[in-house]
A protein has these predicted regions:
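Helix-adjacent hinge/juxtasegments
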Residues: 64-80
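Histidine- and aromatic-rich ligand-binding microenvironments
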Residues: 14, 48, 110-111, 132, ...
Length: 148
């Protein structure tokens, strides 16, 4: 039987998973907790500084609260994004904008942060845990997306 290292994987965590974890809806919070526990059981958890910055806008979430949260949960923060992440995010964002123009899409707009999160996961060869699988499957067809 192989060692844990032979099958361990890294899972990147989207902002919406952490927000769901803090949600007052026990069903949503429980689903997010179960998904995080499952991902942690398969390997390590990581997120981008983009997620950290987005979470600072959540009500009642201070910088020190977030520092403690990430330390206690063992979710590592990748504070630096490589050039390849920025380029991949830019290409995906460009494709998204072109699709919106072509279809005259009046639906919700996406922000660059979503594409940085997806590109970070793709370039790091991580799976991405999210509640928004449609966006990431469309923008990053080669990314392994896990829906909460």
């Amino acid at each position: 039987m192989g060692s844990r290292a032979a099958w361990a994987m890294t899972t990147a965590i989207d902002t919406n998973v952490i927000v769901a974890l803090w949600d007052r809806d026990p069903g949503l919070s429980s689903a997010a907790q179960s998904a995080l526990d499952g991902a942690l059981g398969r390997g390590t958890l990581v997120t981008t500084a983009t997620v950290f910055a987005e979470l600072m806008a959540a009500p009642g979430r201070s910088e020190s609260f977030l520092d403690s949260f990430f330390r206690e949960t063992g979710i590592n923060i990748d504070w630096a994004l490589e050039e390849s992440v920025w380029r991949t995010a830019g290409r995906a964002f460009q494709g998204y904008a072109a699709r919106r123009r072509k279809h005259r899409d009046a639906g919700p707009r996406r922000i660059l942060a979503n594409f940085l999160i997806g590109a970070h996961a793709l370039e790091g060869d991580y799976s991405l845990l999210t509640l928004d699988d449609h966006l990431y499957r469309t923008a990053f067809p080669h990314l392994t997306v896990v829906r909460v």
